[in-house]
């Protein structure tokens, strides 16, 4: 359970993910994983805190799971891949999702966009996002997760990075 995490940020993220419907479970992981200390198995996120390098990686991986339907999410294990779909847009959407989640939780986005991630592009991504240069929003809007631009003005709903919902239906 999330309260089994000793790190405050990991606990905060795990609680949030469990609250929105993504199951996070503290568990010792004996196998090598795509990201140290994180194992996706049938849509659940197992976390070995002793091996976890960056708590923010939980939000990014959750961002991938968030775009799967509940039924499809249960089939996802290991490195999250959507068969027959280019992963580039899903990656960009997960970046946008995890940035919004970090702001919602009140944690420094540098926790998600750390120097060890995004193939060396973390600082550039974070700079763009902090300047309001958002990407991945079309997918978030199509999934009903957020609004932006004229849609936000016309609907009276706060625009991204505010999220209407966190998971695809």
Name what the model sees in each region.
Residues 121-169:
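Pan-zinc metallopeptidase signature
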Residues 9, 55, 90:
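Hydrophobic (often cysteine-bearing) scaffold residues that line and stabilize catalytic clefts
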Residues 33-34, 67-98, 118-120:
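Post-HEXXH active-site segment of zinc metalloproteases
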Residues 4, 42-57:
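Short pre-active-site segment immediately N-terminal to the catalytic Zn-binding motif
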């Amino acid at each position: 359970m999330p309260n089994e995490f000793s790190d405050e940020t990991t606990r905060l993220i795990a609680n949030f993910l469990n609250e929105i419907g993504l199951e996070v479970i503290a568990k010792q992981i004996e196998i090598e994983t795509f990201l140290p200390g994180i194992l996706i198995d049938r849509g659940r996120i197992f976390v070995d805190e002793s091996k976890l390098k960056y708590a923010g990686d939980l939000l990014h991986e959750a961002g991938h799971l968030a775009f799967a339907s509940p039924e499809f999410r249960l089939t996802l294990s290991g490195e999250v891949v959507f068969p027959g779909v280019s992963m580039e847009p899903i990656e960009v959407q997960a970046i946008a999702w995890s940035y919004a989640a970090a702001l919602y939780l009140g944690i420094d986005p540098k926790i998600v966009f750390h120097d060890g991630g995004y193939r060396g592009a973390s600082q550039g991504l974070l700079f763009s996002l902090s300047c309001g240069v958002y990407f991945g929003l079309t997918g978030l809007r199509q999934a009903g997760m957020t609004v932006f631009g004229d849609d936000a003005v016309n609907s009276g709903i706060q625009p991204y990075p505010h999220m209407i919902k966190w998971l695809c239906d």
